[in-house]
Curated annotation (Swiss-Prot):
Enzyme class name: isomerase
Chief place of localization: cytoplasm
InterPro entries: PPIase_dom_sf, PPIase_FKBP_dom, Trig_fac, Trigger_fac_C, Trigger_fac_C_sf, Trigger_fac_ribosome-bd_bac, Trigger_fac_ribosome-bd_sf, Trigger_fact/SurA_dom_sf
Keywords assigned: Cell cycle, Cell division, Chaperone, Cytoplasm, Isomerase, Rotamase
Organism: Verminephrobacter eiseniae (strain EF01-2)
Protein name according to UniProt: Trigger factor
Catalysis performed (reactions): [protein]-peptidylproline (omega=180) = [protein]-peptidylproline (omega=0)
Length: 440
C-alpha cells in the first residue's frame, strides 16, 4: 500500500492511498463464492446458482462494500503509522488516472490541534470554599417549616403584608387595550415570594380585603412576553382574601414529618447538616470547575477543527429540537435555528473538550477506578437504598462514561489549582446555594 500525506491548511490534510486491485478483487471473489453457497434465485436450487449469475446480480454491491472497508482500514492504519490524530470522518474520493494494477483514493480530513497552555504559575484563579454553620442549619430548618405552613384567613380590616397569602382579581391594559395573560380571577400568591413582579406586590402590600386599586407596571425590555416587553400597563387589582401564614412548631412532630428517625430535633439538625454538606460538595465542585474552565479558555491557544465544530452545532440543534418537542411543540424541526446562534456555544464546547482532553492525556489525569467508585457512592448516598443505586449506576454504561468524564474533569481542576495562583474566598452556604448571578 502506497501512502502520501499533504498539508492543505493548518489542520486539514490530504492522504493519498493506493491499493492493489488484486487485494480488492480477491476479497470480492471470496465474498461472492460464500454468497453462492446460500443465495436463492428463481430457476436454481439453493447453493447451485452459477458464480457468473451471482456476480452479475451482486457484484457491484459487494465491490462497493469491500472497497469501503479496505480503504477505511487502510486509512486507519496509515493514520496511526503517521501518528495523525484524526478529527472527524475523512471525505474519501476515488482519483482518476490511477497506476495500472492499483486503485487510488484521496482522503481529506482534519487532525486535532496542538494545545498550548500558558504557564499556570502565572494564572490567577478564584477558589471558593464554605462550611455548614448552625446559622445555615437554622435557615434551612426555617425553609422546611415554611414548606409545611398553613394559612388562616385574616380579619377583614387587616392589611396585607409580607408572607401573607392573597387572592386577587386583576386586569391589565396597555393604551386601554387588554393583552394576553393580563387578566385573572381568584389568583393566589404569597407576598414577597413571587411569582408576581415586584411592582405588583408593592401595590398589593397594605391593601385590605375588598379593596381595589389601579397602578402602572412597567415591563422590562427583556420580559419573556414579547407583546408587553418594554411597555407600561395599567392594572386594576381587587383583593378578595388575605391569609396569614402559621409555621409548625419545632418539635418531634415536625422532625418525624421531615424523616428524622428518632423524632428528635438534634437528629433532624444532623440530617440537615449531612444534606447541606452533600449539596455544598456538589456546588463547590461545579463552581470551582467552572473557574478553572474559564481560566484555561483564556490561557490556551489552539485551532478548532471545523468538523468537530459542525458536529457540535448539529448536536446542539438536535438537543434544542428535542427540548421543544418535549415541551409540546409539534414538528419543531420546521423552526429554523440559525447556525450563528449556536456556533459560539459549539466553539466554546469544542475548545474546552480539546483542552481538557490534552490535560488528561499530557498529565495522566484519567479517572481511576477507585475515584469513580467514590463518586458513584457519593451520588447514591442520598437515596433510600444506596447499594441498589450503586449497582444501577454500574449497570448503565452510558451513565458510567459520563461519571468517568466528570471525575477526569475534577482531576484537571485539582491539577490546575495546585499550580496556579489561587485566590481563596470563603462564602456563606446561602451565597453558594442561592447565587444572585444565575450563571453561578
Amino acid at each position: 500500500m502506497a501512502v502520501t500525506v499533504e498539508t492543505l491548511d493548518k489542520l486539514e490534510r490530504k492522504m493519498t492511498l493506493s491499493l492493489p486491485v488484486t487485494l480488492i478483487q480477491s476479497e470480492v471473489d471470496m465474498r461472492l463464492r460464500r454468497m453462492a453457497r446460500t443465495v436463492k434465485m428463481d430457476g436454481f436450487r439453493p447453493g447451485k446458482v452459477p458464480m457468473a449469475v451471482v456476480a452479475r446480480r451482486y457484484g457491484d454491491a459487494v465491490q462497493y462494500e469491500v472497497l469501503t472497508n479496505k480503504v477505511g482500514e487502510a486509512f486507519t492504519v496509515a493514520a496511526n503509522e503517521a501518528n495523525l490524530r484524526v478529527a472527524g470522518r475523512p471525505r474519501i474520493t476515488e482519483t482518476q488516472g490511477t497506476a495500472e494494477g492499483h486503485v487510488t483514493f484521496d482522503a481529506i480530513f482534519e487532525v486535532f490541534p496542538e494545545v498550548r497552555i500558558a504557564d499556570l504559575a502565572n494564572v490567577e484563579i478564584e477558589k471558593l470554599s464554605t462550611e455548614v454553620t448552625e446559622a445555615s442549619i437554622d435557615k434551612t430548618l426555617q425553609g422546611l417549616r415554611k414548606q409545611r405552613r398553613s394559612f388562616a384567613q385574616r380579619a377583614h380590616d387587616a392589611p396585607a403584608q409580607d408572607g401573607d397569602g392573597v387572592t386577587v382579581d386583576f386586569e391589565g391594559k396597555i393604551d386601554g387595550e387588554p393583552f394576553a395573560n393580563g387578566k385573572a380571577e381568584n389568583f393566589r400568591f404569597v407576598i414577597g415570594e413571587g411569582p408576581m413582579p415586584k411592582e405588583f406586590e408593592d401595590a398589593v402590600r397594605g391593601m385590605k380585603s375588598g379593596e381595589s386599586k389601579t397602578f402602572p407596571l412597567a415591563f422590562p425590555t427583556q420580559y419573556h412576553g414579547q407583546e408587553v416587553a418594554g411597555k407600561t400597563a395599567d392594572f386594576l387589582v381587587t383583593v378578595k382574601k388575605i391569609e396569614s401564614a402559621h409555621l409548625p412548631e419545632v418539635g418531634e412532630a415536625l422532625a418525624r414529618s421531615l424523616g428524622s428517625a428518632d423524632g428528635s430535633i438534634e437528629g433532624l439538625r444532623a440530617d440537615i447538616r449531612k444534606t447541606l454538606e452533600r449539596e455544598i460538595r456538589s456546588h463547590l465542585r461545579a463552581r470551582n470547575r467552572r473557574a478553572v474552565m474559564n481560566a484555561l479558555l483564556a490561557n490556551a491557544d489552539l485551532e478548532l477543527p471545523k468538523a468537530s465544530v459542525q458536529d457540535e452545532i448539529a448536536r446542539l440543534k438536535a438537543n434544542a429540537y428535542a427540548d421543544l418537542k418535549q415541551r409540546g411543540v409539534k414538528d419543531p424541526e420546521r423552526l429554523e435555528i440559525p447556525e450563528d446562534k449556536v456556533r459560539p456555544t459549539a466553539e466554546r464546547n469544542v475548545r474546552l473538550r480539546l483542552i481538557f482532553s490534552e490535560m488528561v492525556r499530557a498529565h495522566g489525569l484519567r479517572a481511576k477506578p477507585e475515584q469513580v467508585r467514590a463518586y458513584v457512592e457519593e451520588l447514591a448516598a442520598s437515596y433510600e437504598k444506596p447499594a441498589e443505586m450503586v449497582r444501577g449506576y454500574y449497570g448503565d454504561r452510558r451513565r458510567m462514561l459520563e461519571i468517568e468524564s466528570s471525575v477526569s474533569e475534577d482531576n484537571v481542576t485539582e491539577f490546575v489549582f495546585a499550580r496556579a495562583k489561587v485566590v481563596a474566598r470563603t462564602i456563606s452556604v446561602d451565597e453558594l446555594l442561592n447565587p444572585k448571578d444565575p450563571k453561578d
